[in-house]
Regions:
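Hydrophobic alpha-helical segments that form the core
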Residues: 4, 101, 114-123, 158-176, ...
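Helix-turn-helix
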Residues: 22, 26, 30-64, 68
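Short helix-capping/turn signature of helix-turn-helix
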Residues: 59, 120-128
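Hydrophobic alpha-helical connector segments
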Residues: 68, 82-114, 163-166
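Short, basic, alpha-helical segments at the C-terminal edge of helix-turn-helix-like DNA-binding modules
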Residues: 71-77
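Amphipathic C-terminal alpha-helical segment
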Residues: 105, 127-128, 149, 167-185, ...
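N-terminal intrinsically disordered/low-complexity leader segments
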Residues: 1-18
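Amphipathic alpha-helical packing segments from all-alpha helical-bundle domains
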Residues: 78, 93-100, 128-154, 161-164, ...
Length: 199
């Protein structure tokens, strides 16, 4: 939902007609694991299977590729929330499904649990990069708005406040996953949030 793994098998010498989504997925995984500053162009060549000239031609420089991965993450997360809202499950089951997908995604990564690319990497770069900051703000607003929409549709009278609590827990789960928290700890925190909101 918010961060499902984009891991793919690495391929070298990818043909000219490469799949843009697949390449962005591979780049997302590398950035998610190593962060923006910690990811080199050689890392991206290794992850995507594209050589530097092809990467530059398709996406521009490293920063432009990073921004494209953030845009893709926002779009994919929004789509996941839309599907959850459309499923029309009761409030408790909706929240349980949301957190289950989130925890599953956060526990994936190239070298171990990597959390959410937005929370784990863009928050650092947002301080001095206006475009990254704008994307992070858009992501946070999208999360707040979609979870509020979900809760309003289920009749929650405190939907706005509860949505912000849920978003805060989602971000905490990302940090805890990167810190090595076991699945049981993440699931317990998610269950506490569900109980707080759904009663």
């Amino acid at each position: 939902l918010v961060q499902k793994s984009d891991q793919i098998a690495r391929r070298r010498g990818r043909p000219r007609g490469f799949d843009t989504g697949e390449v962005l997925g591979a780049a997302t995984e590398r950035f998610r694991t190593r962060g923006y500053a910690g990811t080199s162009l050689d890392d991206l060549v290794d992850a995507t299977g594209l050589q530097r000239p092809s990467l530059y031609a398709a996406f521009g420089d490293k920063r432009a590729l990073y921004l494209a991965t953030l845009d893709r993450t926002i779009e994919r997360a929004g789509r996941g929330f839309d599907q959850l809202i459309a499923a029309d499950l009761p409030i408790r089951q909706s929240l349980q499904a949301m957190f289950r997908t989130i925890v599953d995604g956060y526990l994936t990564g190239e070298t171990g649990p990597s959390g959410c690319i937005m929370v784990s990497t863009s928050a650092t770069s947002a301080v001095d990069d206006a475009e990254i900051r704008a994307r992070l703000a858009a992501f946070l607003k999208m999360e707040d708005d979609r979870i509020e929409e979900l809760l309003v549709a289920r009749g929650d009278p405190a939907a706005r406040a509860h949505a912000r609590v849920a978003t805060a827990v989602i971000h905490s789960l990302s940090v805890r996953a990167r810190a090595g928290a076991p699945r049981a700890e993440l699931e317990a925190l998610a269950a506490d949030c569900v109980a707080l909101i759904a009663g």
